[in-house]
Amino acid sequence: MKFGFDIDDTLIDLRQHAFHLYNKKLNKKVGLDVFHSLKTIEIHEAFGMTSEEGSHMWNSLLDEIYYTSCSPFPYAVETLQELEKQGHEIYYITARPKEHGEQTKKWLIEKGFPVHEDRFFYGMKDEEKIHFIQEIKLNYFFDDKPAVLETLIGKPINVYAKTTSYNQHLNIPRITSWTELGDIIKKEM
């Protein structure tokens, strides 16, 4: 089977990593309870920033956010390694900017994710991502972003939301922990 995965906030805990960096850079101590209550993908409001200030902060820290100590979600690496071992095809489909594609791929490999050159795609806007997902005929796709998930509802693909504070309003199947994927596959077969 073909499995597709978004990367940020689906396989790796990027927003929480960025949240800690913001606290450090701004010399603040905004609690994780605030982070977990955010209803938007963007985290700047928790620090009293405008959209413009938040965008500037995010872009100024991009390399540090993407390539330092950001952790994969528990069991994400092991789960994808197991899928690969079972003979499934794993696709990574991310909206990360083109200039970060190759370094992101290298970073994922260093973390232990099974990455194949011909199944790693980056630099796509949401609309492109959606068309591409349909074009390659994935059996399963996992993402955190409401705009992507909502557009795939009703398409011939099993779509799952990686549970986050900002996608709770979606009424679609979800995955909270990567340990659940084996059971999901068994149920669907």
From Swiss-Prot:
Keywords, sorted A to Z: Hydrolase
EC number: 3.1.3.-
Enzyme class: hydrolase
GO function term, MF aspect, one: 5'-nucleotidase activity
GO biological process: deoxyribonucleotide catabolic process
Protein origin, superkingdom: Bacteria
Pfam families: NT5C (PF06941)
Listed PANTHER family: NUCLEOTIDASE YQFW-RELATED
Family to which the UniProt record says this protein belongs: Belongs to the 5'(3')-deoxyribonucleotidase family.
Name of the protein: Putative nucleotidase BC_3386
Organism: Bacillus cereus (strain ATCC 14579 / DSM 31 / CCUG 7414 / JCM 2152 / NBRC 15305 / NCIMB 9373 / NCTC 2599 / NRRL B-3711)
Lineage: Bacteria, Bacillati, Bacillota, Bacilli, Bacillales
